[in-house]
């Protein structure tokens, strides 16, 4: 099974941050779920009222599982795509970019994440937190909330100043 059952600390924290961020938003906002795995964040975004949702993963099995999860949950209009985030060239902006990835990859692809309003980043170990926060601040990304669970962190950041 592809990563992402909703029970892992990073996924659970990301879901909570996404729900809290968007609970009062009007329907139709957009989300890119990078490293979508089983598609849980993308599918939850649709349930929370997102309009345009894209899930990207490098693993073909993950994309198949994400599509199957969408069918099982009767959730439509989620664009799951196979892709290498290092080669990804986003078009337009997203209201939210969620990325549950290891910190080195998050830092590497950070310039591609900035055309958005909000970032939800997870998959980062506590011992890597300071480095990631420094890089975000250097890029004019404002950290709004950092969650900790066990050895993991997840964070919500506003990147509107970084554009």
Describe the predicted segments one by one:
Residues 20, 58-163:
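S-adenosylmethionine
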Residues 2-4, 104:
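Active-site beta-alpha loop architecture of Rossmann-like, nucleotide-cofactor-dependent enzymes
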Residues 2, 54, 120:
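Conserved short-loop catalytic and cofactor-binding motifs
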Residues 5-86:
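Conserved SAM/SAH cofactor-binding pocket of Class I
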Residues 1, 34, 123-125:
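Glycine-rich beta-to-alpha transition loops that act as phosphate-gripper elements at the mouths
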């Amino acid at each position: 099974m592809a990563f992402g059952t909703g029970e892992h600390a990073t996924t659970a924290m990301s879901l909570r941050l996404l729900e809290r961020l968007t609970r009062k938003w009007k329907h139709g906002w957009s989300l890119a779920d990078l490293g979508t795995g089983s598609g849980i964040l993308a599918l939850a975004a649709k349930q929370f009222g997102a309009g345009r949702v894209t899930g990207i993963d490098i693993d073909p099995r993950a994309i198949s599982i994400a599509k199957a999860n969408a069918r099982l949950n009767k959730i439509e209009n989620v664009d799951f795509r196979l892709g290498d985030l290092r080669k990804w060239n986003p078009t337009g902006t997203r209201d939210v970019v969620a990325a549950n990835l290891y910190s080195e990859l998050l830092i590497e692809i950070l310039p591609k994440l900035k055309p958005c309003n909000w970032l939800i980043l997870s998959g980062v170990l506590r011992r890597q937190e300071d480095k990631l926060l420094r890089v975000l601040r250097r890029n004019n990304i404002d950290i709004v909330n950092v969650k900790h669970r066990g050895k993991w962190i997840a964070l919500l950041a506003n990147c509107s100043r970084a554009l």
